């Protein structure tokens, strides 16, 4: 979570620092955004690194080239509501360096299954234009959601907002496909989180959504791990 550094006037951070300092660890902390490390998503999280033999410097992390939604998912099969399978073949060629990275070592495509949306949800989605959301709906169809971002479509040329555990629900936020009348699939969400295609998610739909939505993006974790390794070798 991002606000652990500042919430309750820094109480929780101070508790962590005191306890780890007592064990001989030096602490470094910073808020990192996954978009700076090759992840097609605006995702800010607080990271705390404790080390006993060195002081870690977050400036050692190396930023990566920006990746957008088109780079991330345009090669995945265009599914309608309730289409797809747990395991399938790739139907389209690789269209970006990011897709090549995601497909590496994966002979099959997994978890590319679209939610079975209700007819009411499908009718709403049909009213929503590219790059827009709830503002396209008549006020009587807005529902109880207060946030402006609900029923939003992802933009091919931009990064995604933060993926959460309810990305399978169009009314939850900006997590509908840029063109198709459905929310993103678990595999599309996993791509946006930077999980490679050979990482397979098991369990029911709720469990899979939690596994993906609560995760630290692997490419961000990789950048942090490389920076820690640099510190160890100094």
Identify what each model region corresponds to.
Residues 1-141:
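Class I S-adenosyl-L-methionine
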Residues 96-234:
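C-terminal target-recognition/interaction regions appended to catalytic cores
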């Amino acid at each position: 979570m991002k606000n652990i550094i500042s919430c309750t006037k820094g109480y929780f951070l101070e508790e962590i620092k005191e306890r780890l300092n007592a064990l001989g660890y030096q602490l470094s902390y910073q808020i990192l955004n996954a978009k700076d490390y090759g992840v097609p998503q605006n995702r800010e999280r607080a990271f705390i690194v404790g080390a006993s033999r060195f002081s870690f410097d977050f400036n050692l992390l190396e930023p990566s080239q920006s990746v957008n939604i088109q780079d991330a998912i345009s090669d995945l099969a265009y599914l309608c509501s309730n289409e797809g399978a747990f395991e399938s073949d790739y139907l389209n060629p690789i269209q970006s360096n990011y897709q090549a990275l995601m497909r590496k070592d994966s002979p099959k495509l997994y978890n590319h299954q679209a939610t079975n949306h209700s007819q009411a949800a499908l009718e709403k989605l049909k009213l929503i234009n590219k790059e827009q959301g709830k503002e396209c709906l008549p006020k009587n169809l807005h529902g109880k959601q207060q946030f402006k971002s609900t029923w939003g479509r992802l933009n091919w040329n931009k990064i995604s907002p933060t993926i959460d555990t309810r990305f399978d629900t169009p009314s939850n936020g900006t997590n509908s496909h840029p063109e198709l009348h459905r929310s993103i699939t678990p595999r599309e969400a996993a791509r946006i989180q930077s999980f490679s295609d050979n990482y397979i998610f098991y369990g029911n739909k709720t469990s899979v959504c939690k596994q993906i939505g609560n995760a630290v993006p692997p490419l961000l974790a990789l950048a942090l791990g490389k920076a820690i390794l640099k510190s160890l070798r100094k």
